[in-house]
């Protein structure tokens, strides 16, 4: 989250300086010479697990970095999601009880009943 905040703040700051001109960069396409003190940071995007998406709404402009593995997993789970109308449920039916059968049973294993004992000065709760 800290990286995203720093990256967002940097991009917003750079965007606000739109009237400034870029410094001339010497070199060809394969090698670029940039002053070391002007570098803010470097993020290697060569891996397949990082994707960059541009974000633009009424208040924010910037780049969003996401983990592609998690995005693909979420998309596959949402494709398998069944909505209310498609859910597999048992059909409606009347409840039937045998003689002496309770309406529901408690699932938890409760401790057997016993008297409470308190030490001197011990609170009730």
UniProtKB/Swiss-Prot annotation:
Protein's UniProt keywords contain Signal: yes
Name of the protein in question: Mating factor alpha
Molecular function in Gene Ontology: mating pheromone activity
The keyword Signal is annotated on this UniProt entry: yes
GO terms, biological process: mating; pheromone-dependent signal transduction involved in conjugation with cellular fusion
InterPro entries with a match to the protein in the record: Mating_factor_a, Mating_factor_alpha_C, Mating_factor_alpha_N
Any one GO CC term of the record: extracellular region
Origin: domain of life: Eukaryota
A Pfam match: MF_alpha_N
Glycosylated position list: 57, 67
Entry's transmembrane regions: none
Signal peptide residues on this chain, from the entry's feature table: 1-22
Keywords from the named record: Glycoprotein, Pheromone, Signal
């Amino acid at each position: 989250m800290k990286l995203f905040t720093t990256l967002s703040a940097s991009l917003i700051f750079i965007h606000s300086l739109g009237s400034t001109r870029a410094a001339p960069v010497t070199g060809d396409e394969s090698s670029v010479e940039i002053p070391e003190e002007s570098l803010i940071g470097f993020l290697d995007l060569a891996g397949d697990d990082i994707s960059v998406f541009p974000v633009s709404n009424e208040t924010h402009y910037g780049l969003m970095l996401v983990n592609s593995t998690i995005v693909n997993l979420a998309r596959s789970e949402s494709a398998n999601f069944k909505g209310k109308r498609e859910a597999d449920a048992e059909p409606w039916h009347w409840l039937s009880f045998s003689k002496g059968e309770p309406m529901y049973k408690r699932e938890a294993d409760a401790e057997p009943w016993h008297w409470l004992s308190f030490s001197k000065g011990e609170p009730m709760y």
